[in-house]
Amino acid sequence: MPKRAKKNEEGVDGEADNGTAAAKKEKKGKEPEAPILYEDPPEKLTSKDGRAANMKITSWNVDGLRAWVKKNGLDWVRKEDPDILCLQETKCAEKALPADITGMPEYPHKYWAGSEDKEGYSGVAMLCKTEPLNVTYGIGKEEHDKEGRVITAEFPDFFLVTAYVPNASRGLVRLDYRKTWDVDFRAYLCGLDARKPLVLCGDLNVAHQEIDLKNPKGNRKNAGFTPEEREGFTQLLEAGFTDSFRELYPDQAYAYTFWTYMMNARSKNVGWRLDYFVLSSALLPGLCDSKIRNTAMGSDHCPITLFLAV
C-alpha cells in the first residue's frame, strides 16, 4: 500500500503521483480546486433477501500497531464494536504487543501473525468475540508465509481471511513476486471456497479501477495500479468472488481508504481504495452494507466495516 517515500517496501504507492505532480505544474495564482470528500452514507442493516445483519466485521491497516494504539485507535474500535476486528501492517512481534490490546476483554480470542525474518515489517491480526472453529496462518507456501500476511479463521457458516497483500515496491522490484503471490493466493482462496464460502478482508494493495483512485493517469506505472496488479484482482473476481463495496456502490467516486502522509493528501481527499471486503458468491444474498469509515484517524488508512447476514 502507498506509504511515505522514505520507506522501502511500503513506499511505492506513496511515491505515485497522488496529485502532487499535477499540483506542482499548476500556474501561479490559479485557485486550487476544492476537494470532493466522500460521506459515508447511513448503514444498511438488511440484506436484499430481507435478513437482518448479524455479523459485523471491521478491517483496518493500522500502519504500526503500537503507534496506532498510542493514537487512540482502540477508542474508535470500542465505539464501532465489531464482532471481529482484523488488522494489517501491525509491524509488531507477538512478544512486543501492547497490553492495551492483548488485554481487551471485548475480544477474548486473539490471533497474531508476524514476519519471521524482519522486525517491524508486515504482520496481521484477528480479534474475535466468538471463538472460531479453527485458525490457520499463511497459505501453505513458505515463500509467502514467512512474511506473516494471512490469517484464516473458520466459523460455522464461512471462512474469514484477513490479508496484507505484498506491495510491488519502489521501482516495481517486487512486481514479479506480487504476480506469483496473486496466482497462489487465488488458488488458496478457491480451495477454501470449495469447502465453505468466505469473506476476504484487508489491504489488498491494488486500486482495481480508475474510479478507485484520485489520479489514475499519473499512476499507471506505479505499484498498486499497474496493469498486472489490476488484472490479478480481475482474475480473483472472475474466479467467483465479489468486491462488496462496488456491488453496492458501483459508481461511487472519491471513496478511498488510503492517503499518503505527504502534501496534505487526506484533507484534499487525494487517495486510493486499497482495502476491501471480497465475498464468495454464496454470501452475496446476505450482504447488507460495506462501509468506508473515512473519518477515523490513527493511520494512513481508514477502517472499513462489513455488515452481513449469515
From Swiss-Prot:
Record: residues binding Mg(2+) 1: 63, 89, 300
Alphabetized PROSITE patterns for the sequence: AP_NUCLEASE_F1_1 (PS00726), AP_NUCLEASE_F1_3 (PS00728), AP_NUCLEASE_F1_4 (PS51435)
Comment on bound cofactor: Probably binds two magnesium or manganese ions per subunit.
Disordered: annotated segments: 1-51
Marked site: Transition state stabilizer: 205
InterPro entries named among the record's database cross-references: AP_endonuc_1, AP_endonuclease_F1_BS, AP_endonuclease_F1_CS, Endo/exonu/phosph_ase_sf, Endo/exonuclease/phosphatase
Effect of residue 58 to C: Confers redox activity
Keywords: Cytoplasm, DNA damage, DNA repair, DNA-binding, Endonuclease, Endoplasmic reticulum, Hydrolase, Magnesium, Metal-binding, Mitochondrion, Nuclease, Nucleus, RNA-binding
EC class: hydrolase
Binding locations of Mg(2+) 2: 203, 205
GO molecular function, one term: RNA binding
Entry's localization field: Nucleus; Nucleus, Nucleolus; Nucleus speckle; Endoplasmic reticulum
EC numbers, comma separated: 3.1.11.2, 3.1.21.-
Catalysed conversion reaction: Exonucleolytic cleavage in the 3'- to 5'-direction to yield nucleoside 5'-phosphates
Biological process, per Gene Ontology: base-excision repair; heart contraction; heart looping; negative regulation of apoptotic process; positive regulation of gene expression; positive regulation of gene expression via chromosomal CpG island demethylation
Site (Important for catalytic activity): 275
Active site: 164, 203
Cofactor: Mg(2+); Mn(2+)
GO (cellular component) term, any one: mitochondrion
Family: Belongs to the DNA repair enzymes AP/ExoA family.
Function: Functions as an apurinic/apyrimidinic (AP) endodeoxyribonuclease in the DNA base excision repair (BER) pathway of DNA lesions induced by oxidative and alkylating agents. Initiates repair of AP sites in DNA by catalyzing hydrolytic incision of the phosphodiester backbone immediately adjacent to the damage, generating a single-strand break with 5'-deoxyribose phosphate and 3'-hydroxyl ends. Has 3'-5' exoribonuclease activity on mismatched deoxyribonucleotides at the 3' termini of nicked or gapped DNA molecules during short-patch BER.
Protein name: DNA repair nuclease APEX1
Organism of provenance: Danio rerio
Lineage, top ranks: Eukaryota, Metazoa, Chordata, Craniata, Vertebrata
